[in-house]
A protein has these predicted regions:
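Eukaryotic helix-grip
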Residues: 45-223
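Short polybasic linear motifs
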Residues: 7, 12
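Sec/Tat signal peptide C-region and signal peptidase I cleavage site
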Residues: 40-44
Length: 223
């Protein structure tokens, strides 16, 4: 998409200097400006900034359009087959052992290839804990790729007293086979925490979320 926009921009820019008609030049000028702004915006939204690389785990953050809160993405490789990782991700008995800052968790429903979880997340004083109902959708793309979509459903159950319901959560896990015994794991999320947590305070802390989650998950997978 970005390459296409850049090509259009280059064509318009070239036309701007070769067209002799004044009215046409003005139109091309404004069209060129609009395309440039759209292209710059698209590029900015897709640029992931590396913020941490340690213990074989890479973490990136990105500014999202229309939000003060950044998204995170983490990547790692594990010595394990895709199906073994999926088995761990689906195991409701151990999910609280690898989700970071998990204060409480309950499997609400299993439906076909979907799981619905209620999860309470611990936050440091003076902030109240957050909670959300998450829908995990397990999708086998092909024999070498598996995706888990993670979507928050804030209205699924009534809010609990003393806990702030998150406004929005959305992300996914992507498992890609590298060879018969190695899998690349990508974990990406964007969260709107709700309440009165300023973005300047929240954004630096999101780096630890995927990093700690990956470390704990890898320890379980590679036991």
């Amino acid at each position: 998409m970005n390459e296409f926009c850049i090509l259009i921009f280059a064509f318009l820019l070239l036309s701007l200097f070769t067209v002799n008609n004044d009215r046409m030049q003005k139109r091309l000028f404004w069209i060129t400006i609009i395309v440039l702004l759209l292209t710059s915006s698209a590029l900015a939204q897709e640029n992931w900034k590396p913020v941490k690389e340690e213990a074989g785990i890479k973490v990136y953050t990105k500014t999202e359009s229309g939000s003060e809160y950044k998204s995170f993405k983490a990547e790692m490789k594990v010595n394990c087959k895709i199906e073994n990782i999926v088995e761990v991700l689906k195991n409701s008995d151990i999910i609280n052992s690898w989700i970071v800052n998990c204060k409480g968790i309950k499997l609400l429903k299993t439906e076909d290839n979907d799981q619905y979880y209620y999860i309470e997340t611990s936050l440091p004083f003076p902030f109240k804990n957050r909670d959300m109902v998450y829908r995990f959708q397990y999708i086998e793309i092909n024999s070498e790729q598996f995706r888990v979509n993670v979507t928050g459903i804030p209205e699924y159950i009534k809010p609990r007293e003393g806990i702030v319901r998150m406004a929005k959560t959305n992300g996914f896990w992507l498992l890609s086979s590298i060879d018969t015994s190695t899998t690349a794991v990508t974990y990406q999320m964007h969260v709107e925490p709700g309440g009165l947590i300023p973005a300047w305070l929240a954004n630096p802390f999101i780096v630890n979320v995927p990093f700690s989650t990956f470390k704990d998950l890898r320890n379980i997978i590679q036991k």
